[in-house]
């Protein structure tokens, strides 16, 4: 599939800046093809690793039903959204990624993914603490992996101009 070019390409973030937004972010919105043709967009925590995003969820529900029906998804993270009332605008920075999601099946890949997520959100935990948390939540846990096919980052033109002025 060909992905659309961003219309305002002067506002395009570099690949490094785009990856940095995903590495820094703590939550985003996962958009899926939902029931009866309605989009289903759900806020979710994640971890970014290379060209993959990892999410956790329960072993059943709307999200998994949608993914099983159609594994294509988009994921959006807003890094900055500073409202500037006197200019009738916002100074924003965001990323959108498109890709395909799969449920991680084997215990090994599921475990590797949940450990990445745990290290992101609880970086100072002990190995024993992380192990206890993973074991406690293991039975109902489903891990998802989104392989990114295309992603772009964009920022407000005012931020682009400010960078050039430095």
Language-model segments: what does each one mean?
Residues 1-24:
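Extreme N-terminal tail/first-helix region
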Residues 2-10, 82-166:
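Charged, gly/pro-rich active-site loop segments
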Residues 15, 60-61:
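Structural motif corresponding to alpha-helix initiation and N-cap regions
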Residues 21-22, 66-67, 117, 146:
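A generic structural signal for nonpolar/aromatic side chains embedded in well-ordered alpha-helices
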Residues 23-25, 38-39, 88, 139:
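Short solvent-exposed loop/turn micro-motifs enriched in small/polar/acidic residues
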Residues 25-59, 75-76:
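Short beta-strand segments
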Residues 27, 41-43, 72, 92, ...:
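Broad gene-expression machinery/nucleic-acid interaction feature
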Residues 63-92:
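Helix-adjacent hinge/juxtasegments
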């Amino acid at each position: 599939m060909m992905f659309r070019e961003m219309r305002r390409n002067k506002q395009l973030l570099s690949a490094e800046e785009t990856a940095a937004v995903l590495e820094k972010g703590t939550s985003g919105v996962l958009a899926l093809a939902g029931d009866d043709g309605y989009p289903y967009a759900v806020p979710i925590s994640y971890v970014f690793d290379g060209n993959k995003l990892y999410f956790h969820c329960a072993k059943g529900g709307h999200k998994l039903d949608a993914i099983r029906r159609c594994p294509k998804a988009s994921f959006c993270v807003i890094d900055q959204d500073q409202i500037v009332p006197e200019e009738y605008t916002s100074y924003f920075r965001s990323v959108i990624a498109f890709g395909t999601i799969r449920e991680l099946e084997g215990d090994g890949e599921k475990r590797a993914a949940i450990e990445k997520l745990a290290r992101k959100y609880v970086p100072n935990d002990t190995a024993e603490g992380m192990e206890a948390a993973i074991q406690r939540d293991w039975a109902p846990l489903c891990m998802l992996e989104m392989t990114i096919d295309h992603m772009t980052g964009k920022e407000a033109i005012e931020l682009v101009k400010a960078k050039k002025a430095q």
